[in-house]
């Protein structure tokens, strides 16, 4: 009788492990906003990459909490968009294998360059405003961190042509 109950108790454990595995392996973009700061965690089959609009120590701690909450001890890459120098460089370096940040001496992405890891890619679409294309598996996201990014992408040759199957993220409140 006791052995039967022990075996039955294993069913919920196996079910929760299976559900956690399925959640961990799906493709998604987790978006967190706090005041004017944004964190975008791209997830693909257990891998992760992060984009942050802020570069200070608080932003890095928030990025760490976000990645750890979703099961990522270390991300493939991080893109920090804030050009203002802070004393949080060491924190950002511990988050990922590669950190693209002006504070760390790496210039922003240039046209034609990509941050890339298996199933995750970020590409700059135009210089002004930093409009970007984020690929998460088969998903395509157009990222517009600033108002200038939207108009810049509309006028660029690599811009938002055929964006009907793309999802869109705005890092600003559009004006009416």
What are these regions (language model features)?
Residues 1-176:
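Non-globular, low-confidence helical/coil segments that flank catalytic cores
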């Amino acid at each position: 009788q006791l052995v039967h109950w022990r075996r039955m108790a294993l069913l919920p454990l196996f079910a929760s492990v299976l559900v956690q595995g399925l959640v961990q392996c799906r493709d998604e973009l987790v978006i967190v906003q706090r005041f004017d700061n944004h964190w975008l965690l791209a997830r693909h089959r257990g891998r992760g990459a992060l984009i942050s609009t802020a570069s200070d120590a608080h932003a890095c701690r928030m990025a760490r909490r976000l990645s750890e909450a979703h099961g990522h001890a270390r991300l493939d890459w991080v893109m920090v968009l804030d050009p203002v120098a802070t004393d949080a460089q060491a924190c950002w370096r511990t988050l990922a294998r590669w950190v693209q940040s002006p504070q760390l001496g790496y210039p922003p992405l240039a046209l034609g360059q990509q941050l890339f890891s298996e199933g995750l890619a970020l590409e700059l679409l135009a210089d002004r405003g930093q409009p970007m294309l984020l690929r998460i598996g088969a998903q395509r996201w157009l990222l517009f961190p600033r108002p200038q990014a939207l108009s810049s992408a509309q006028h660029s040759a690599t811009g938002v042509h055929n964006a009907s199957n793309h999802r869109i993220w705005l890092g600003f409140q559009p004006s009416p």
